[in-house]
Each structure stands twice: as structure tokens, then as C-alpha cells.
Amino acid sequence: VIEFGGLSGLINNASVYQPISFDELTFEEFKKNFTIHVEVPFLLTKGLFEQLKAKSGSVIGLVDTSQGRAWKDLTHYTASKNALRQMMVNLAGDLHPHVRVNCIAPGAIISAAWEIEHFASVLEKVPMGRSGEPKDIASAAKFLLESDHISGQIINVDGGWTLVE
């Protein structure tokens, strides 16, 4: 950070995704999701705020497209990702004008977290007819990090999935 003259961006990208039926869901697993998806981004943002403020920086939270939807066996995941989404929106109001805060909501992106059977059924519903790739998320993040007049926004990077789902 010192070598590059300070910190101008933070991307809260840590995640855990494991479908678990509600009857098998433990409080420990529920809490783990909130720790990774909400507590860690809070602590990082809080701990790095002064450095970000000094550079008029940007914070990005990777949320998901689950808001307002019921996803089977993902109560713990969707509850924590939507808590992160709301925290980021609130931080956009709390940290302005010093730090911009936005979210990226990935749709079907090729990753080790997706089970191939589930992935195939999701792709059938994506208007663009293909999955996204990590570079699609990186492009959105680069755009938000460089955009000095965008804050409090959620960008869906989902090939149009949320339009039809």
C-alpha cells in the first residue's frame, strides 16, 4: 500500500456457498455465512476507512441476485448476502462524500462453487445464453472503482437473468 501511495479501493469478495436444507442447517453454519459475508466486510471497511477516505476511494461488495427470491436450501446464504447488500447501501450514505460504496450482484458465473446440475438449469434461463466468467465481474469492478460519481448502486452482472427470473 505504501509503495503505491495509499489504498483507493476495497473489494469485499469473500464468500461461501453450500446448499443445506433447513432441517439440516445448524446455527454454526448460519453464523459462518454471516461472519464471512457481513462481519468480515464490515471489519475490513471499518479498518481501512481512513486510508480509503484519504484517496477518495471506493468500496465494492459482491452480493448476489437473490433479493426478493426464495432459493431452496440457501436460507443461510441468501440471508447473509442480502444483509451485506443492505449494509453496503447504508454505507454509501454514511461514508459519502469521502468514499463511494457500490455492489456487484453476479448471476451464473463459472466457478467451483456451482454444482454442474444446478448450473445447467440456471443457464437455460439466462437470456444471453451463456454463463458469465470471472472477467465479467472484474470489468464491472474496474468500472465502479474508476467511476467517481457513482455510489449506492447495485450492478447485476447476470446476462439478463434477473429480468426473466
Q: Where do the language-model regions lie?
A:
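Conserved NAD(P)H cofactor-binding loop of Rossmann-fold oxidoreductase domains
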Residues: 13-18, 160
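Catalytic loop of short-chain dehydrogenase/reductase
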Residues: 58-83, 88-96
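Amphipathic alpha-helical dimer-interface segment in Rossmann-like NAD(P)H-dependent oxidoreductases
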Residues: 36-54, 92-93, 97, 142, ...
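Catalytic Tyr-x(3-8)-Lys segment
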Residues: 117-136
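Substrate-binding pocket helix/loop in short-chain dehydrogenase/reductase
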Residues: 21-22, 29-31, 114, 122
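Catalytic Tyr-X3-Lys loop
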Residues: 8, 16, 23-42, 60, ...
